[in-house]
Regions:
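Short, intrinsically disordered, charge-balanced linker/junction segments flanking boundaries
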Residues: 1, 147-149, 167-176
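Outer-membrane beta-barrel translocator/receptor signature
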Residues: 1-55, 62-69, 80
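Hydrophobic, lipid-facing positions within transmembrane beta-strands of outer-membrane proteins
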Residues: 4-6, 22-26, 67-71, 116-122, ...
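One face of beta-strands
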Residues: 4-10, 24, 96-98, 133, ...
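Transmembrane beta-strands of outer-membrane beta-barrel proteins
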Residues: 4-8, 37-41, 83-85, 133-139, ...
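Outer-membrane beta-barrel strand-turn architecture
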Residues: 31-36, 75-79, 126-130, 174-176
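Flexible loop and strand-edge segments within Gram-negative outer membrane beta-barrel domains
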Residues: 48-68, 76, 80-135, 141-165
Length: 176
């Protein structure tokens, strides 16, 4: 971020008088007067009930509930160095099919996913030779927790689960 700012937005929509969808989002940036530190934040929320366009009991648009949040911050300990930190998270639930009041394996057909994703990492930058050269040392990690059901005909074995952790680290030198 390079300046202080704040924004909030919200929408509410309706599909053919049947289903409501809500969205709320916000962004903020805060920067010190000498630009030695700053942070940018974002958030969003979206919610939609399932939509059955032709009244056959099956959704054309599935149920959706999503929350996201993230930030990027920096601190300049000296004129020629910067420490940055990022963090992002997503929590999302989606479900399509029919009989939404029942468990997924009790329906005729269900496609359902639930994701919780967390990621982030630090970076350290050092600038040399009047900013013509830069050395960056960085790391990041992401954890994904996913539960799913892709089943038909009341299949109790259609559930899936994934847990994954990924990490990356490295260094990069750039010179002009």
């Amino acid at each position: 971020p390079v300046s202080n700012s704040f924004q909030v937005s919200s929408t509410m929509s309706n599909l053919n008088g049947k289903v409501w969808e809500q969205y709320v989002g916000a962004n903020a940036s805060l920067v010190s007067s000498d630009n030695s530190y700053g942070i940018a934040l974002y958030q969003s929320y979206r919610n939609r009930n399932p939509y059955d366009a032709d009244n056959d009991g099956f959704s054309e648009l599935g149920k959706l509930n999503m929350n996201t949040f993230g930030l990027r911050s920096y601190y300049r300990p000296t004129q020629f160095s910067r420490i940055s930190l990022e963090y992002h998270t997503t929590n999302e639930f989606r479900r399509g099919g029919n009989k939404f009041d029942l468990q997924p394996h009790e329906t005729d057909i269900t496609e359902q996913t639930k994701h919780i994703i967390n990621s982030g990492g630090p970076t350290y930058d050092v600038f040399f030779n009047e900013y013509r050269h830069k050395l960056s040392v960085y790391g990041s990690a992401q954890h994904t927790d996913r539960n799913s059901d892709y089943g038909a005909d009341k299949n109790a074995n259609a559930y899936g689960k994934t847990k994954d952790l990924t990490a990356v680290g490295g260094a990069m030198y750039v010179g002009n």
